[in-house]
Structures are given as C-alpha cells and as structure tokens.
C-alpha cells in the first residue's frame, strides 16, 4: 500500500503517519528524514545535500528525486510506505510517477488533509517548546500546568520564530500557491482522497482507514 500525505503546515500529517505505520506495518518517509539520512551516510549524494542545506538553500528537484528513488527502493518499502513532504510541486509529482514506474510500483492513495488557514494559525501559533528538554505544548489543546513552564523539567517555554502568526500565514499562502496544483494533478488521476483535517486525531485516523479499506 503506497500512499502520499498532502496538507498544509500544521495539518498533522506526521502525527497521523506515526499512528498509521504501527497499524499497517509500513515505513513513514519524510523528505526531512531522507535528507538527514543522506547526509549521515557520507555518500556523494549526501555530501551535495549537506553543502546545500548549510547554505540554507532548497535542495533542487533532481537531487530530491534521486534521494526519494533510493529510499523507496529499500527493502522496508516492499509492502508499502507513507510519503510525507513530497511531492510539493507538479514537476515533483510527475517525477514520482516516473520513480514508481521504474520501481514497478503504483501509487495507491493520495490523502489530502484539508485544514483552513485560521485552523492552521490556531494550531501552530499556539505551539510552545521547552527550551531545556524539547517537549512540545499547545496553549489550547495541550497547555502546560504552569504558564510558561515545562511540566517535565520546569524549563522555560518559547515560541519558534516560524511559529509566529504572520510567518504561519505566509507559510500557508506559499503552500497553497505551490502545492495546491499537486492536489489538482492527483484529482485528475482519481487517486486523491480528501479528509477533514480539522477533526480530532482519532476521527481522522478512522477516515483514512475507511478510505484504504474500501
């Protein structure tokens, strides 16, 4: 079962993937993890990625595509995978089609977690992180017992720069401009399934399971 998860920042893709991989016994593959693995491997590809990331640049499509193909060809993907963070553009979606063909696989489901801008802003701008142990809180859904202090270690909670409201709104708009065409691309191939990402986690998981068990 080969799946792609799409959705704006704060849609919960990583959370849903972590729950589902335990049920389905397939790996969760994110581009961030793939880049880190490539760098750690010290391969020629990894060295190129490391140089690009150190400069703060985006990894170009040709390199990203090579890393995705390499990861999807590994043994643990033989029964399926959940791909998160790729494709982000129509060009990458077409490249993924080619990658799947070259590996003799099909893409079974593209799940789009639909969340509106205000919900994304509410989720991300209320996120706080412990400066000491890294535990993540949400002032609305998972608040600390003492305002501004970590329940675990007593460390001070802070807000990341890219979690601030104006930045979150920009990230959402960039996502919709760049990635929404990918959603339209998959609609044409009848592989796209939309899930209401504003529901609670258990309800979203149930929706996804209903889709893949039809």
From Swiss-Prot:
One of its GO terms (biological process) is AMP salvage. Its EC number is 2.7.4.3. It is found in: Cytoplasm. Its main location: cytoplasm. Zn(2+) binds at residues 130, 133, 150, 153. The keyword Zinc applies. Residues 30-59 are annotated as: NMP. Pathway: Purine metabolism; AMP biosynthesis via salvage pathway; AMP from ADP: step 1/1. Keywords: ATP-binding, Cytoplasm, Kinase, Metal-binding, Nucleotide biosynthesis, Nucleotide-binding, Transferase, Zinc. Residues 126-163 are annotated as: LID. AMP binds at residues 31, 36, 57-59, 85-88, 92, 160, 171. GO terms for molecular function: adenylate kinase activity; ATP binding; zinc ion binding. Monomer. Belongs to the adenylate kinase family. Consists of three domains, a large central CORE domain and two small peripheral domains, NMPbind and LID, which undergo movements during catalysis. The LID domain closes over the site of phosphoryl transfer upon ATP binding. Assembling and dissambling the active center during each catalytic cycle provides an effective means to prevent ATP hydrolysis. Some bacteria have evolved a zinc-coordinating structure that stabilizes the LID domain. Catalyzes the reversible transfer of the terminal phosphate group between ATP and AMP. Plays an important role in cellular energy homeostasis and in adenine nucleotide metabolism. This is Adenylate kinase. The lineage of its organism: Bacteria, Thermotogati, Thermotogota, Thermotogae, Thermotogales.
């Amino acid at each position: 079962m080969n799946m792609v998860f799409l959705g704006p920042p704060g849609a919960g893709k990583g959370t849903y993937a972590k729950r589902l991989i335990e049920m389905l016994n397939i790996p969760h593959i994110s581009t961030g993890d793939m880049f880190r693995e490539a760098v750690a491997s010290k391969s020629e590809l990894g060295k190129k990625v490391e140089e690009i990331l150190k400069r703060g640049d985006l990894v170009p499509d040709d390199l990203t595509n090579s890393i995705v193909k390499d990861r999807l060809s590994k043994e643990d993907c033989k029964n399926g995978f959940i791909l998160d963070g790729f494709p982000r553009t129509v060009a990458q979606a077409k490249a993924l089609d080619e990658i799947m063909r070259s590996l003799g696989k099909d893409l079974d489901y593209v799940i789009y977690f639909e969340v509106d801008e205000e919900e994304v802003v509410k989720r991300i701008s209320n996120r706080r992180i412990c400066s000491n142990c890294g535990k993540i809180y949400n002032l609305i859904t998972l608040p600390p017992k003492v305002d501004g202090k970590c329940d675990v270690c007593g460390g001070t909670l802070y807000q990341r720069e890219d979690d601030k409201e104006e930045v979150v709104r920009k990230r959402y708009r960039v996502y919709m401009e760049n990635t929404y065409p990918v959603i339209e691309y998959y609609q044409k191939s009848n592989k796209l399934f939309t899930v209401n990402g504003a529901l609670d986690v258990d309800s979203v998981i149930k929706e996804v399971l209903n889709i893949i068990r039809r």
